[in-house]
């Protein structure tokens, strides 16, 4: 950021995440989050990943505001990013797809995820560069929130040969908690179990002049 400021660049686009927005205690259910919301990094339910994303974005806004350059910054906040991959490596989002297809989850954990198409995310970055409407804004990128069981059903339709391996029922929350004692990677799910996340991304579509691809 400092290098960009020193070079007097016209616009800075920062990639963040919705995890910088919705992690906080005492959430209602369903819980609606938006552009003005921030994750509480002091909350025990905020893990290293969500804390790092939140603090990095907050530091960016603080720096730009201190320089009087807030309007030169636009932040892109996608959800779970799915779609065409550049290589065979899986990221946090696509790892769920891989584990489902391999039959690692007999049942789907009870939580939802905002589905973001990777091409929509890329396009949002490009469109933001020359668009003054998004100056100083946080743009939530994604079409709709889907529960993991719904994701499994979509995958079964798209990949019939894997249908038998995919979860067909929702895993009780207590079972997920028990598994978390054996598998530390499951612990990050616990704070969001049973909470239906909701958000309205139409403002991002309007500002960018684009329509996000549906989850399916």
Q: What function would you assign to each model-found segment?
A:
Residues 40-45, 88, 94-120:
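A conserved pocket-lining segment of Rossmann-fold NAD(P)-dependent short-chain dehydrogenase/reductase
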Residues 124-188:
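Mid/C-terminal beta-alpha module of Rossmann-like enzyme folds, strongest
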Residues 178-211:
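Conserved C-terminal active-site "lid" loop/helix of NAD(P)H-dependent oxidoreductases
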Residues 83, 108-111, 139-146, 156, ...:
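Glycine-rich Rossmann NAD(P)(H)-binding loop
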Residues 1-48:
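Conserved Rossmann-fold NAD(P)-dependent oxidoreductase catalytic core, especially the SDR/UDP-sugar
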Residues 42-74:
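Active-site Tyr-X1-5-Lys
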